[in-house]
Swiss-Prot record:
Belongs to the eIF-6 family. Keywords: Initiation factor, Protein biosynthesis. One of its GO terms (biological process) is cytosolic ribosome assembly. It comes from Methanoculleus marisnigri (strain ATCC 35101 / DSM 1498 / JR1). This is Translation initiation factor 6. The keyword Protein biosynthesis applies. The keyword Metal-binding does not apply. One of its GO terms (molecular function) is translation initiation factor activity.
Amino acid sequence: MTGTIDLAGDPNIGVYARVFEDIAIVYPGAPAEFTAALARELDVEIVSTFIQGSSIIGSLVSGNSQGLVVSGLATDEELAVLSEYRDVFLLKGPMNAAGNIILANDCVAAVHPEMQIDVAEEIGSFLEVPVVRLTLGGIKTVGMAGFATNKGILVHPRANDTEIANLERIVDLPIGLGSVNMGSGLVGTGLLANSKGYVAGSVTTGFELGRIEEVFGFLE
């Protein structure tokens, strides 16, 4: 259910993969020990593809059980792989790093505060969730300043009461402050989780792990 891991020595595991309840999207050639840990700890099928030819899957993909929101620069070959598992929404225009700018689960999608309203509404309709434009800890790239599963939402330790209230008005889940990798507030860069388990970056401290377990309901 739990553990810490790196990816070829890099603890920023959330940059290179995106996890859902049933699948984990990881770039081809990712270390076997990394993909095996995701499959084992999170009980997911591994889906292997690049996005726009890049390995930074976590930065370029968001979504939930309803669908995937993907950079509009993804290739037809990459989209063919993804479409075997979900419907796919292409995020076009200059603000297209979906994983960086969308924090989503099956209850809500929080998006970059400067995202065009019509685009945000399209994403909400596609994912079948309400949408809120906000910052977390003053950071606009909410997909990396927070991490959401269907059991809780972990947010940047400097997130203020107003930012948290904006989420609480929409979603009835535990929302807590936390960090990863020895103090990084960009929790999405160092965490992969679903309702069944989690893995955190290899330098995440015991205190940080305890906070992750509390917010996501893994304390026994």
